[in-house]
């Protein structure tokens, strides 16, 4: 799993992994101000995300009935919050994802589920979050799968006013891969 590291400046966000210092990792940045420098950086980052990543404008939105139905058709209705179950589900659901990335994703997802349990979330809530994250992964982030684990990681540009707790869970999982 990749570690989350802090950027010393915005241009760090475009560096390949090998140029990110002694402990390479991923960046998770929220910009809350505007300047000509930020505008220029965002244009470069936007182009990088367009070429090799995902651009999300506005919130992701809940999966619709058709998407949930397809998820259930493909994976069944069973759910177990453990890495083996999630890795097996990802084999069917995300065929372009490498086995190593399936394992990393499953471990990161289980870490997030464990954190939710510690906060008092029920199994039903955790199952619903699992279904939501799996739908988002398939319908919004599938394009990232071939690039995960590369020296030049995919970019995610998320343009919105506020990120929901569930969206943060997915972004956190992806940042740990």
Question: Model-predicted segments: where are they?
Answer:
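Conserved N-terminal ligand/cofactor-binding loop architecture of enzyme catalytic domains
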Residues: 1-11, 18-135
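Short boundary motifs at domain starts and secondary-structure transition points
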Residues: 11-21, 141-150
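Active-site and donor-binding regions of nucleotide-sugar-utilizing enzymes
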Residues: 115-177
């Amino acid at each position: 799993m990749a570690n989350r590291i802090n950027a010393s400046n915005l241009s760090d966000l475009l560096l390949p992994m090998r140029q990110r210092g002694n402990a390479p990792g991923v960046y998770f940045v929220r910009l809350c101000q505007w300047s000509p420098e930020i505008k220029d950086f965002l244009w470069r980052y936007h182009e990088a995300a367009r070429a090799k990543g995902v651009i999300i404008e506005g919130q992701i939105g809940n999966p619709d009935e058709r998407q949930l139905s397809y998820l259930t058709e493909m994976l069944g209705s069973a759910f177990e919050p453990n890495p083996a179950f999630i890795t097996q589900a990802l084999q069917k659901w995300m065929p372009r994802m490498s086995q190593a990335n399936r394992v990393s994703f499953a471990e990161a997802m289980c870490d997030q589920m464990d954190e939710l349990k510690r906060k008092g979330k029920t199994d039903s809530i955790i199952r619903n979050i699992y279904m939501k994250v799996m739908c988002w992964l398939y319908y919004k982030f599938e394009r990232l799968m071939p690039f995960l684990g590369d020296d030049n990681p995919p970019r995610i540009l998320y343009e919105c006013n506020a990120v929901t707790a569930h969206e943060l869970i997915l972004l956190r999982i992806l940042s740990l891969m």
